[in-house]
From Swiss-Prot:
The gene is EXO1. Binds 2 magnesium ions per subunit. They probably participate in the reaction catalyzed by the enzyme. May bind an additional third magnesium ion after substrate binding. This is Exonuclease 1. It comes from the Eukaryota. Residues 138-229 are annotated as: I-domain. Mg(2+) 1 binds at residues 30, 78, 150, 152. Residues 655-671 have a biased composition (Basic and acidic residues).
Length: 846
């Protein structure tokens, strides 16, 4: 029966485990628990008296499972009825008999399911059934032991003596006997619930004041097989009494149990005597020692205990009879000889193998039996490993040694072999990696049969000495868009004029403006290299920490298919068009950039680090950037000086410095003079093409203003003036603003977006972009009060008029028809006075 609710009460001390945890160890099994489970499957046959051995197969299935995990099981069976438990056994026997009679009656009535339930409750495990399991287990070399009385006390003794390391059972009484480790509710796969005595302190209900003795007292007070509990006393109240009581005399505590619980409980004298008997039964119940082969009490008797008075805990018999009972040779009820098994003369049984190395273990199977003369209990795993370690590993506190690993071949990870470098990069090669790279696709010349090599000549400034170094960087050709090339050639042959403004920017390739550039710039050029003027600025060209970088780039674009390799800048090349792109550069000292570049398309121009929306001047996509696309409509002037756009950039920079620094007058004067000189030399066609030049906004962290460049007012203006409005720096990254295309800038400004109406279209198809277009800085800017439309403004526009229109007073009496006609807004007030409406009036007033 066990102790009601004990497992739930101490669930904190339980732990789910698998039985393989005890591999190589010995466990004891309460076999009657397996017998009861196995008998349920054949309860109907057992009730009818029909022969069956299904319960034997059920038990052996668990035995084989333990053997397969390398665990040695010892099957323990119940023996004679304990005198202190005769009343309990008699009541159980009467209950089983009543269920058996009821089941037979229900079976006669045809109620099979209800009869089967009654047969299940009437199962009685006899010694004959246990003997069948003993024979089946011995055939496989499994030790079996029949307890002189109860199997619980015998199992507890085996665990305390160290013969077994754990106990497999379904009865919670084992904890009251003082077992150290108990495995409960184990299934056929080996999963179970382990309760360790050392973990009982983890139970919050028990606390840290509980001992093994108090735990046993609690189990007895809550009700056990040897004594029923008082009315209204369970585990919780029994635990509360023992936690509050400090008196070591348990008899006095029981007499004052009503005082501790504040209950009106009268404790009879018979209950106190029954408590003492139950406690002595848990302590001194007789068990069989398989090593000494005699009956002994579970615990040694104390000095004040008389063994003669403990007859209720078991009566002594002769040791030879006790041995025969333990071996299963005698019936526990009649003491008749039913078997002649002798462990000393019996041949070792050969159990079936469970793994490939089981043969080595079968040789010592007889020696490992508990019935062998030389058998000694296996010490616990903790004591085996601790004792030698203390001797072999002395303390190393305060000991210092110098350890050398020179002679040791330590395992290490294989080192990753780096790729050997043929030669280190020079400073010029390193600088060329950070410069703008351009490519030119090689094309086949049908007339000459030779190929022109793609090259890019880059003049890199020397930051130390000052003179420029010329480098030729060869890059692999880039694959062009075949479909775009085909459409371009088709448009050129048909003579169609393609306006870039009417094309979709999503499907426009990098070379889609070649035909336009060929028609615009048709004059030969005398020079293909442009030298920029020196800039006396105090910012670094490479890697300023504030993120400011302005690069001056002059791109010479040749739209022809072939350019000879021996071309000299001074030669005259007919039918060629060259497009230049300007950039500004800052350096620590004065520097010059001279580039002679012949890329196939403008789409291949991109910087080394092209950040999206950042400092890069070229797009990541093959489509041309806005500034590059518009530069193809400009033509180079004959003067060897820089282009006007470069001057525009210089002037803008000088004007931005003019507001903050008053000491830069020489620079401004020099820039303005150069601007006026070069503007005068600008030709008519050059001025027409420069109408579409672009204004690039420069960045800074200190100033904020708008950038607005008004180039020309109308197409008919043939002068080459460049009207420059205020130039300043924004707190946003550098962007290329394209006239006619409104690009979304970064959300760094808190001002609202103001869109001006578009003006008249230009000849190129692109409209001029409004001067000041600002975006909201944050995505949450629409929640600001200044940017929201209030309800009052909406009601002003859509509200109803309060004052209704009143008809002017008249001297004539009102007419119910004439004066109730509401005039429409289109009708005139004197509609009735017109002669052409007289017929209508007569029809109305008649």
């Amino acid at each position: 029966m066990g102790i009601q609710g004990l497992l739930q009460f101490i669930k904190e001390a339980s732990e789910p485990i698998h039985v393989r945890k005890y591999k190589g160890q010995v466990v004891a099994v309460d076999t009657y628990c397996w017998l009861h489970k196995g008998a349920i499957a054949c309860a109907e046959k057992l009730a009818k008296g029909e022969p069956t051995d299904r319960y034997v197969g059920f038990c052996m299935k668990f035995v084989n499972m333990l053997l397969s995990h390398g665990i040695k099981p010892i099957l323990v069976f119940d023996g004679c009825t304990l005198p202190s438990k005769k009343e309990v056994e008699r009541s159980r026997r009467e209950r089983r008999q009543a269920n058996l009679l009821k089941g037979k009656q229900l079976l006669r009535e045809g109620k099979v399911s209800e009869a089967r339930e009654c047969f299940t409750r009437s199962i009685n495990i006899t010694h004959a059934m246990a003997h069948k399991v003993i024979k089946a287990a011995r055939s496989q070399g499994v030790d079996c032991l029949v307890a002189p009385y109860e199997a619980d006390a015998q199992l507890a003794y085996l665990n305390k003596a160290g013969i077994v390391q754990a106990i497999i059972t379904e009865d919670s009484d084992l904890l009251a006997f003082g077992c150290k480790k108990v495995i409960l509710k184990m299934d056929q796969f080996g999963n179970g619930l382990e309760i360790d005595q050392a973990r009982l302190g983890m139970c919050r209900q028990l606390g840290d004041v509980f001992t093994e003795e108090k735990f046993r007292y609690m189990c007895i007070l809550s009700g056990c097989d040897y004594l029923s509990s008082l009315r209204g006393i369970g585990l919780a109240k029994a635990c509360k009494v023992l936690r509050l009581a400090n008196n070591p005399d348990i008899v006095k505590v029981i007499k004052k149990i009503g005082h501790y619980l504040k209950m009106n409980i009268t404790v009879p004298e018979d209950y106190i005597n029954g408590f003492i008997r139950a406690n002595n039964t848990f302590l001194y119940q007789l068990v069989f020692d398989p090593i000494k082969r005699k009956l002994i009490p579970l615990n040694a008797y104390e000095d004040d205990v008389d063994p003669e008075t403990l007859s209720y805990a078991g009566q002594y018999v002769d040791d030879s009879i006790a041995l025969q009972i333990a071996l299963g040779n005698k019936d526990i009820n009649t003491f008749e000889q039913i078997d002649d098994y002798n462990p000393d003369t019996a041949m070792p049984a050969h159990s079936r193998s469970h793994s490939w190395d089981d043969k080595t273990c079968q040789k010592s199977a007889n020696v490992s039996s508990i019935w062998h003369r030389n058998y000694s209990p296996r010490p616990e795993s903790g004591t085996v490993s601790d004792a030698p370690q203390l001797k072999e590993n002395p303390s190393t506190v305060g000991v210092e040694r110098v350890i050398s690993t020179k002679g040791l071949n330590l395992p290490r990870k294989s080192s990753i072999v780096k790729r050997p470098r043929s030669a280190e990069l020079s400073e010029d090669d390193l600088l060329s990696q950070y410069s703008l790279s351009f490519t030119k696709k090689t094309k086949k010349n049908s007339s000459e049969g030779n190929k022109s090599l793609s090259f890019s000549e880059v003049f890199v400034p020397d930051l130390v000495n000052g003179p420029t170094n010329k480098k030729s960087v060869s890059t692999p050709p880039r694959t062009r868009n075949k479909f775009a090339t085909f459409l371009q050639r088709k448009n050129e042959e048909s003579g169609a004029v393609v306006v870039p403004g009417t094309r979709s920017r999503f499907f426009c390739s990098s070379d889609s403006t070649d035909c336009v550039s060929n028609k615009v710039s048709i004059q030969p050029l005398d020079e293909t290299a442009v030298t920029d003027k020196e800039n006396n600025l105090h910012e670094s060209e490479y890697g300023d920490q504030e993120g400011k970088r302005l690069v001056d780039t002059d791109v010479a674009r040749n739209s022809s298919d072939d350019i000879p390799n021996n071309h000299i800048p001074g030669d005259h090349i007919p039918d060629k068009a060259t497009v230049f792109t300007d950039e500004e550069s800052y350096s620590f000292e004065s520097s010059k950039f001279t580039r002679t570049i012949s890329p196939p398309t403008l789409g291949t121009l991109r910087s080394c680090f092209s950040w999206s929306g950042g400092l890069g001047d070229f797009s990541r996509t093959p489509s041309p950037s806005p500034s590059t696309a518009l530069q193809q409509f400009r033509r180079k002037s004959d003067s060897p000086t820089s282009l006007p756009e470069n001057n525009m950039s210089d002037v803008s920079q000088l004007k931005s410095e003019e507001s903050s620094d008053d000491e830069s007058h020489p620079l401004r004067e020099e820039a303005c003079s150069s601007q006026s000189q070069e503007s005068g030399e600008f030709s008519l066609q050059s001025s027409n093409a420069s109408k579409l030049s672009q204004c690039s906004s420069k960045d800074s962290d200190s100033e904020e203003s708008d950038c607005n460049i008004k180039l020309l007012d109308s197409q008919s203006d043939q002068t080459s003036k460049l009207r420059l409005s205020h130039f300043s720096k924004k707190d946003t990254p550098l962007r290329n603003k394209v006239p006619g295309l409104y690009k979304s800038s970064s959300a760094d400004s808190l001002s609202t977006t103001k869109i001006k109406p578009l003006g008249p279209a230009r000849a190129s198809g692109l409209s001029k972009k409004p001067a000041s277009i600002q975006k909201r800085k944050h995505h949450n800017a629409e929640n600001k009060p200044g940017l929201q439309i209030k309800l009052n403004e909406l009601w002003k526009n859509f509200g109803f008029k309060k004052d209704s229109e009143k008809l002017p007073p008249c001297k004539k009496p009102l007419s119910p028809v004439r004066d109730n006609i509401q005039l429409t807004p289109e009708a005139e007030e004197d509609i009735f006075n017109k002669p052409e409406c007289g017929r209508v009036q007569r029809a109305i007033f008649q």
